[in-house]
Swiss-Prot record:
Binding site for Zn(2+): 176, 178, 189
Protein name: UPF0758 protein A1S_2918
Annotated family: Belongs to the UPF0758 family.
Pfam annotation, one family: RadC
NCBIfam families per UniProt: PRK00024.1 (NF000642), radc (TIGR00608)
Domain named MPN: residues: 105-227
Biological-process GO terms, alphabetical: proteolysis
The organism's place on the tree of life at top rank: Bacteria
Entry annotated with the keyword Nucleus: no
InterPro entries referenced in this protein's UniProt entry, alphabetically: MPN, RadC_JAB, RuvA_2-like, UPF0758, UPF0758_N
Length: 235
């Protein structure tokens, strides 16, 4: 039987907790419940949100689901589906504007990772990318340099370094994706990072980090102390 959120203790209601503690204090299902606003006769908004995430596997997958897939759930109709599409598009436009700024400052590893996830989203093959930064951690240029298969991408250290020098980079972040599976680095990934780090040191470019991004998460070489201590990691 549906227990209305209105009957919950105030400190447990998602909207009240969001206002008091901030959105980061809420789970994916609680945030989705605030968006849904109402559930169905059988389920509260939070219960419906949990069912949706369980069914589709993640919050992202809920937003990517078709109308026919979502309409199977009581409480989801054309109105809520159109709202989902609108919120998804608003998020995309926000990121497009934010990351297209010419003076984009990437002064923390969190911001760098967000930017790289944005640039590499949707790639179905391995892609190796380079982010060039100036001395103040402002973006100079970003480029996807090498493309491979689902499981492998051949990378040239010389071409990577040449590109960084052409952009007058003072600092560098490299990244590649694992389209499927774990973000854990392979022995080849570790060897490549070491080679690039050594090459960067020769031309006085600081390699700040190497990120691996996958559907299961991300891996930072700097955070795992797999870069030389003389390199300055993004704080």
């Amino acid at each position: 039987m549906n227990t209305s959120i209105k009957n919950w203790p105030e400190q447990e209601r998602p909207r009240e907790r969001l206002l008091q503690q901030g959105p980061q204090s809420l789970s994916d299902s609680e945030l989705l419940a605030i968006f849904l606003r109402s559930g169905s006769r059988q389920h509260s908004a939070v219960e419906l949100a949990r069912l949706l995430i369980q069914q589709f596997g993640s919050l992202n997958a809920v937003f990517d689901a078709s109308y026919n897939e979502l309409a199977q759930f009581n409480g989801i109709g054309a109105t809520k589906y159109s709202q989902l599409l609108a919120v998804k598009e608003l998020g995309r436009r926000y990121l497009d504007y934010h990351f297209s700024q010419t003076e984009l400052s990437l002064h923390s590893s969190h911001l760098v990772l967000d930017y790289l996830r944005y640039e590499l989203k949707g790639e179905k093959q391995e892609v190796f990318a380079v982010l060039c930064l100036d001395a103040e951690l402002r973006k100079l240029h970003f480029k996807k340099l090498f493309f491979g298969s689902v499981q492998h991408c051949a990378v040239s250290v010389n071409q990577t370094l040449r590109y960084a020098l052409q952009q007058h980079a003072c600092q560098l972040v490299i990244a590649h994706n694992h389209p499927f599976g774990s973000p854990q680095p392979s022995p080849e990934d570790i060897k490549l990072t070491q080679q690039l780090e050594q090459a960067c040191q020769l031309v006085e470019i600081r390699l700040l980090d190497h990120f691996i991004i996958s559907p299961e998460g991300s891996f930072s070489f700097a955070e795992q102390q797999l870069l030389n201590p003389t390199s300055i990691a993004v704080q």
